[in-house]
Amino acid sequence: MAVSPANQATAATTSAESRSEATGIPGAPKRVSFAKIREPLNTPNLLDVQIQSFQWFTGDEAWFQRRVEEGEENPVGGLEEVLNEISPIEDFSGSMSLSFSAPRFDEVKASIEECKDKDMTYAAPLFVTAEFVNNNTGEIKSQTVFLGDFPVMTDKGTFVINGTERVVVSQLVRSPGVYYSKDIDKTSDKDVFSVRVIPSRGAWLEFDVDKRDTVGVRIDRKRRQPVTVLLKALGWTTEAIRERFSFSETLLATLEKDHTAGTDEALLDIYRKLRPGEPPTKESAQTLLENLFFKAKRYDLAKVGRYKVNKKLGLSTPIENGTLTEEDIVTIIEYLVRLHAGEDKMTAANNTEIPVETDDIDHFGNRRIRTVGELIQNQIRVGLSRTERVVRERMTTQDVEAITPQTLINIRPIGAAIKEFFGTSQLSQFMQQTNPIDGLTHKRRLNALGPGGLSRERAGMEVRDVHPSHYGRMCPIETPEGPNIGLIGSLCSYARVNPFGFIETPYRKVVEGRVTDQIDYLTADEEDRFVKAQANAPISDDGTFIEDRVMARRKGGEVELIDPLDIDYMDVSPRQMVSIATAMIPFLEHDDANRALMGANMQRQAVPLLRSQAPYVGTGVELRAAIDSGDMLVAEQSGVVEELSADLITVMHDDGTRKSYSLYKFRRSNHGTCFNHRPIVNEGDRIEAGQVIADGPSTENGEVALGKNLLVAVMPWEGHNYEDAIILSERLVQDDVLTSIHIEEHEIDARDTKLGAEEITRDIPNVSEEVLADLDERGIIRIGAEVRDGDILVGKVTPKGETELTPEERLLRAIFGEKAREVRDTSLKVPHGETGKVIGIRVFSREDDDELPPGVNELVRVYVAQKRKIQPGDKLAGRHGNKGVIGKILPVEDMPFMEDGTPVDIILNTHGVPRRMNIGQILELHLGWLASQGWTIEGDPDWAKNLSAELRDVAPGTNTATPVFDGAKEEELTGLLSATKPNRDGERMVKENGKANLFDGRSGEPYPYPVAVGYMYILKLHHLVDDKIHARSTGPYSMITQQPLGGKAQFGGQRFGEMECWAMQAYGAAYTLQELLTIKSDDVVGRVKVYEAIVKGENIPEPGIPESFKVLLKELQSLCLNVEVLSSDGSSIEMRDSDDEDLERAAANLGINLSRNESPSVDDVVH
């Protein structure tokens, strides 16, 4: 997207005050903006795609009012729509019926907090009015029926299911409708045209013109027939067909080749194709055809499908009619034959001219969004149809007099369908909660996978590619790398979903070359009819275009210079084409798209730091994104802060009421990061409605703050930052600049077993008192205890199988009581490689009437927090896709320093920039330096004429905003670098070329060349070395191959693969190689003997035969090959399964069990 040159006059700039008004958020922190373009529209609520869809489903009052204001007469919610569809349910004779109406929800049973704490679902009871009518007697019985507990969406757009927060992702699917396509016949190179009628549910209907110029039809993907057979089956005579299609030689030729005479024969012909092997009759054939396309129960285009069909074919069938009509079929055929004949227009039934053209299935006019509400509605429809069957059966079996709606309805299938959807559907996902942007992006995600969507394997390049119709609807940048690229996207900043499920984007109306503030939302196919200018086209104060020719887009994304009078619309904002995460990348316009993609994705992986710091260089989106993420506390009404503590803020409202806001303290998020609230108001402060009163994770003063502003030098340093490695100053470790808190949850339960109940206790066999020192009298660790791997968190014993007791043992048992009973230590221990401090304990037990799963008597959860300082191996990244791993942490005194003695914090390599074409990071570096130092513009230089008054004199440490495609220009940065405020000595450390003279911290000598120095925003990513580093001593082995398992999760070993073996061979390290392949791996006997030899201090014995060799022999024998092993003298060696006696003897002597067999893991199968 082009950016207008700096010397052009653009729309009026915005001041700080007007910006606070424009954002509509009181108490917004100061951020001076380089934006030149006035935006007539505020960013909408970013969670509307989730919240409004669920409101539609439940028929919420707010949704109802909104729709009435938009002019809809009698809006019907999604739940009511399904109940209306299924009602009335009649019995087989039609003498009784049951109908549902007026769905309503009661109050939710428990708060969100309680649900998360006790593993419950945040749900409300759903009631409907059920009416049973006996048609024979006219008797009506009406009852309110409970349909089950229904999961309810929280204010943050999430669901709490079994105690975990989940998000239902919107699905991107092909819209129902009629689609024309053109292919090239392989044999004759002729263009062949076809059309598909795709319903929301029901059989497909396909027509095509083949290479022999005959028109055919395929019903429900069965064999092809001449299209005239279908027309005759619908009751058309040969004469009527001739008359209707007299203009088409193709269709008349098809009619000549069709030998069916009359409707009956045509019906039987269709029946034979659809039901081969069944005896055809006229009645069954007629019923079959009617059921396929003309019965609402079996076939439904849905409102959106009917809307698309009407629009494509110029029909005016009522939108409620979801079945096909005769007129539809005839018009579809006419359109197809005209398309084949090469015509470009046709007159529709309502006497309008419609274009004749093929459809692009990847166009956003033909792809729609199934939002949360619709996905749940489809699931309810499945559950209700199962209930319908039950109701029918009960109507016939129960006594008519005794029937009430309650006795007919079985609610179990509805509950099961909902549970299945929220628990196991591909679209109901565990919410991503690393930081606020991660959660916000997850809720705005568009997923083309899932039931009814595409599959990874089948999706080709076309469907993944960026399409012109994505502009302003789906972000062209933000998508995952890897197999899902292009299949998962993100909603653009201003986009919204209309009632049909199509994505709309806003435009400013242009009337006779003058831009107005009227906003129109257009769908992708409506937009194609208009010419749109970019948001940065220069306009005067009265809204007229300044230039004679304006850069604008036509259909298909073609860009050209156009007369202002020919322009219909103009973009609302330069960031309209990108998603929220992408809009948070400053200088995005200077970054290569591949790197911008990585930048947008890596922001979501940034872990919340101990102290958050907002970026010096932002884009102005930070405030809105943070508030809409729902992770901060926002005042509901204006008032005065009455009382303040770490975990409670009480506000006295202007109307005299009080409201207390609870703050989260050190909670665990779904991804183990720390969720903590911190008040940012004081007692006695006046606050306004909508003002942020407490920061959440990764926010500062209500703005998103994912990382830290660090002083960066861009230079190589002794090769330690080769290949994207990063060098850090030790100051960042000492001052906890990049320190984060991670919280792990450990859980254990005490169950009833066949041999008796398990017990949570401090009384653990064979464990010394010092190991139990931190456990309380119940056997649970105390809060505040420092723990490391292997430490006991909760003591638990499980009964062992008991044999018949001897008289002596019975005596002991009588004296010492239960203590002598055989029990096993099954305590909860800290997993391998983890350390930390116990910060919370939750105990649930049956005795306290807590709901627990069957067989569980007690459940204990322990929360362990870990403070992770930055260390070599951790991954850091900027916002431009510039990522790297810390290679070395240098003492502060060894870091390069500036002329005033300031050492830099971080050294990045210069080689990371040119090849990757993410120059945005260098511009950010310069603007970051400017923001930290402040500047004063003297006089009225040429480069500063587009800067607003608030940018003339900026104090040191002021945060700046450079919005995407409308930010600071290169010449402005160059000019400002020469206008920075001097330091105490009156000097400027960084010259106007953005470089500083640096000195080597070790020798004090200056470096030969000046170096680019400035402040860059650096994020600490979730890929921490503590989670990755791993070492194995003895551990589990695979059952079959007897080789160690792989992977950290299984406490596995490192795979010594084929190429590693070659390396050993190349160096002639024969003994090392033999050890690796035998006693360190799968020589079962050898490894026990080696252990014995090491313990006794003897020489290590000769290795035996590895288990994998025996497995190989067995494999060959299973192929009926007689394989023998021969010694050096040619005699046959008998392969015993294992030297059991030796093995058992050695193991018994040592008191060890080395084999610890485990079932083979996925890794094992792969390796």
UniProtKB/Swiss-Prot annotation:
Enzyme's top EC category: transferase
Comp. bias (Low complexity): 9-23
PROSITE patterns: RNA_POL_BETA (PS01166)
EC number: 2.7.7.6
Region (Disordered): 1-27
Keyword Transmembrane tagged: no
Catalytic activity entry: RNA(n) + a ribonucleoside 5'-triphosphate = RNA(n+1) + diphosphate
Record's keyword terms, sorted: DNA-directed RNA polymerase, Nucleotidyltransferase, Transcription, Transferase
Subunit structure: The RNAP catalytic core consists of 2 alpha, 1 beta, 1 beta' and 1 omega subunit. When a sigma factor is associated with the core the holoenzyme is formed, which can initiate transcription.
Family label: Belongs to the RNA polymerase beta chain family.
Protein name per its UniProtKB record: DNA-directed RNA polymerase subunit beta
Organism per entry: Amycolatopsis mediterranei (strain S699) (Nocardia mediterranei)
Taxonomic lineage of the native organism: Bacteria, Bacillati, Actinomycetota, Actinomycetes, Pseudonocardiales
